[in-house]
Protein backbone atom coordinates (compact mmCIF):
# COMPACT_ATOMS: atom_id res chain seq x y z
CA UNK A 1 0.00 0.00 0.00
CA UNK A 2 1.04 3.57 -0.64
CA UNK A 3 1.78 5.95 2.23
CA UNK A 4 4.26 8.78 2.86
CA UNK A 5 7.66 7.88 4.34
CA UNK A 6 7.40 10.66 6.91
CA UNK A 7 5.10 13.59 7.59
CA UNK A 8 5.61 16.88 9.39
CA UNK A 9 2.24 16.71 11.15
CA UNK A 10 0.47 13.47 12.00
CA UNK A 11 -3.10 14.75 11.61
CA UNK A 12 -4.57 17.17 9.08
CA UNK A 13 -7.84 18.97 8.44
CA UNK A 14 -10.16 17.44 5.88
CA UNK A 15 -9.25 18.55 2.35
CA UNK A 16 -11.50 20.61 0.05
CA UNK A 17 -13.54 18.61 -2.43
CA UNK A 18 -14.82 21.43 -4.63
CA UNK A 19 -13.66 22.60 -8.06
CA UNK A 20 -11.65 20.94 -10.80
CA UNK A 21 -8.18 19.42 -10.64
CA UNK A 22 -5.42 22.00 -11.02
CA UNK A 23 -2.69 19.65 -12.21
CA UNK A 24 -2.19 16.14 -13.55
CA UNK A 25 -4.89 16.56 -16.17
CA UNK A 26 -2.89 15.28 -19.16
CA UNK A 27 -1.60 11.87 -20.22
CA UNK A 28 2.16 12.41 -19.92
CA UNK A 29 3.86 9.01 -19.63
CA UNK A 30 1.66 6.42 -21.33
CA UNK A 31 -0.59 6.26 -24.38
CA UNK A 32 -3.93 5.78 -22.61
CA UNK A 33 -5.30 7.01 -19.30
CA UNK A 34 -8.19 6.86 -16.85
CA UNK A 35 -9.58 10.34 -16.12
CA UNK A 36 -11.83 11.12 -13.14
CA UNK A 37 -15.13 12.88 -13.87
CA UNK A 38 -16.34 13.24 -10.25
CA UNK A 39 -14.81 14.17 -6.88
CA UNK A 40 -13.93 11.67 -4.16
CA UNK A 41 -11.36 10.49 -1.67
CA UNK A 42 -9.45 7.42 -2.85
CA UNK A 43 -7.72 5.31 -0.20
CA UNK A 44 -4.38 3.59 -0.64
CA UNK A 45 -6.17 0.22 -0.53
CA UNK A 46 -8.44 1.20 -3.42
CA UNK A 47 -5.45 2.35 -5.50
CA UNK A 48 -3.68 -0.96 -4.86
CA UNK A 49 -6.81 -2.97 -5.70
CA UNK A 50 -7.21 -1.12 -9.02
CA UNK A 51 -3.51 -1.63 -9.84
CA UNK A 52 -3.78 -5.39 -9.25
CA UNK A 53 -6.93 -5.64 -11.40
CA UNK A 54 -5.16 -3.88 -14.29
CA UNK A 55 -1.89 -5.77 -14.17
CA UNK A 56 -3.59 -9.16 -13.89
CA UNK A 57 -5.64 -8.46 -17.00
CA UNK A 58 -2.60 -7.25 -18.98
CA UNK A 59 -0.57 -10.37 -18.06
CA UNK A 60 2.96 -8.94 -17.82
CA UNK A 61 2.46 -6.86 -20.96
CA UNK A 62 2.74 -3.11 -21.08
CA UNK A 63 3.54 -0.62 -18.34
CA UNK A 64 1.30 1.05 -15.75
CA UNK A 65 1.80 4.44 -14.11
CA UNK A 66 -0.09 5.44 -10.95
CA UNK A 67 -0.58 9.21 -11.19
CA UNK A 68 -2.12 9.80 -7.74
CA UNK A 69 -0.57 9.40 -4.30
CA UNK A 70 -2.33 9.29 -0.90
CA UNK A 71 -0.60 12.14 0.99
CA UNK A 72 -3.47 13.02 3.32
CA UNK A 73 -4.13 11.11 6.56
CA UNK A 74 -7.70 10.54 7.65
CA UNK A 75 -8.64 9.88 11.26
CA UNK A 76 -11.35 7.92 12.98
CA UNK A 77 -12.46 7.55 16.57
CA UNK A 78 -13.21 4.07 17.96
CA UNK A 79 -16.79 2.80 18.07
CA UNK A 80 -18.99 3.86 20.99
CA UNK A 81 -16.73 6.72 22.06
CA UNK A 82 -18.28 10.01 23.15
CA UNK A 83 -17.67 13.23 21.24
CA UNK A 84 -14.71 15.38 22.22
CA UNK A 85 -11.48 14.27 23.90
CA UNK A 86 -9.35 15.21 20.90
CA UNK A 87 -9.01 14.10 17.31
CA UNK A 88 -9.04 10.38 16.56
CA UNK A 89 -6.13 8.17 15.54
CA UNK A 90 -4.97 7.99 11.91
CA UNK A 91 -7.02 5.30 10.17
CA UNK A 92 -5.44 5.44 6.72
CA UNK A 93 -4.22 7.61 3.86
CA UNK A 94 -6.26 9.20 1.08
CA UNK A 95 -5.72 10.96 -2.23
CA UNK A 96 -8.22 13.72 -3.02
CA UNK A 97 -9.33 13.32 -6.64
CA UNK A 98 -11.21 16.08 -8.46
CA UNK A 99 -12.72 16.06 -11.97
CA UNK A 100 -10.13 16.09 -14.75
CA UNK A 101 -7.40 14.27 -12.84
CA UNK A 102 -5.62 11.38 -14.59
CA UNK A 103 -5.58 8.41 -12.20
CA UNK A 104 -3.68 5.75 -14.15
CA UNK A 105 -1.76 5.59 -17.42
CA UNK A 106 -1.01 2.56 -19.58
CA UNK A 107 1.40 1.99 -22.49
CA UNK A 108 2.77 -0.92 -24.51
CA UNK A 109 -0.53 -2.73 -25.10
CA UNK A 110 -3.22 -2.51 -27.83
CA UNK A 111 -6.07 -0.05 -27.28
CA UNK A 112 -8.66 -2.80 -26.65
CA UNK A 113 -6.52 -4.35 -23.89
CA UNK A 114 -5.84 -0.94 -22.32
CA UNK A 115 -9.53 -0.01 -22.46
CA UNK A 116 -10.61 -3.24 -20.72
CA UNK A 117 -7.81 -3.06 -18.11
CA UNK A 118 -8.74 0.52 -17.20
CA UNK A 119 -12.44 -0.42 -17.12
CA UNK A 120 -11.67 -3.18 -14.59
CA UNK A 121 -9.64 -0.71 -12.53
CA UNK A 122 -12.45 1.85 -12.61
CA UNK A 123 -14.83 -0.63 -10.97
CA UNK A 124 -12.53 -0.71 -7.92
CA UNK A 125 -12.63 3.07 -7.46
CA UNK A 126 -15.29 5.34 -5.88
CA UNK A 127 -15.13 7.93 -8.71
CA UNK A 128 -16.78 7.96 -12.11
CA UNK A 129 -14.13 7.97 -14.79
CA UNK A 130 -13.56 7.81 -18.53
CA UNK A 131 -10.98 6.31 -20.88
CA UNK A 132 -8.79 8.91 -22.62
CA UNK A 133 -6.00 8.83 -25.21
CA UNK A 134 -2.91 11.01 -25.28
CA UNK A 135 -3.90 12.59 -28.64
CA UNK A 136 -7.38 13.57 -27.40
CA UNK A 137 -6.05 15.59 -24.48
CA UNK A 138 -3.20 17.19 -26.43
CA UNK A 139 -0.46 15.57 -24.38
CA UNK A 140 3.18 15.94 -25.34
CA UNK A 141 4.55 13.51 -27.89
CA UNK A 142 7.92 11.80 -27.52
CA UNK A 143 8.93 12.50 -31.13
CA UNK A 144 11.86 14.86 -31.72
Curated annotation (Swiss-Prot):
CDD domains per record: Ribosomal_L16_L10e
Region of interest called Disordered, as start-end residue ranges on this chain: 1-23
PROSITE patterns for this protein: RIBOSOMAL_L16_1, RIBOSOMAL_L16_2
Pfam families linked to this entry: Ribosomal_L16
Basic residues biased stretches: 1-19
Keywords: Ribonucleoprotein, Ribosomal protein, RNA-binding, rRNA-binding, tRNA-binding
Entry's Gene Ontology BP terms: translation
GO annotations of cellular component type: cytosolic large ribosomal subunit
Database matches in Gene3D superfamilies: Ribosomal protein L10e/L16
GO molecular function, a single term: rRNA binding
InterPro entries referenced in this protein's UniProt entry, alphabetically: Ribosomal_uL16, Ribosomal_uL16_bact-type, Ribosomal_uL16_CS, Ribosomal_uL16_dom, Ribosomal_uL16_sf
Transmembrane regions: none
NCBIfam families, sorted: rplP_bact
HAMAP family (alphabetical): Ribosomal_uL16 (MF_01342)
Family from the record: Belongs to the universal ribosomal protein uL16 family.
Subunit record text: Part of the 50S ribosomal subunit.
Biological role stated in the UniProt entry: Binds 23S rRNA and is also seen to make contacts with the A and possibly P site tRNAs.
The protein's name in its UniProt record: Large ribosomal subunit protein uL16
Species of provenance: Staphylococcus epidermidis (strain ATCC 35984 / DSM 28319 / BCRC 17069 / CCUG 31568 / BM 3577 / RP62A)
Gene name for this UniProt entry: rplP
Amino acid sequence: MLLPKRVKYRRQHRPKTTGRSKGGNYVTFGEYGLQATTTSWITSRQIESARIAMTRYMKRGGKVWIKIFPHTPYTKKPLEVRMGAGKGAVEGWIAVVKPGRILFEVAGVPEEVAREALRLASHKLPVKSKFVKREELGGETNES
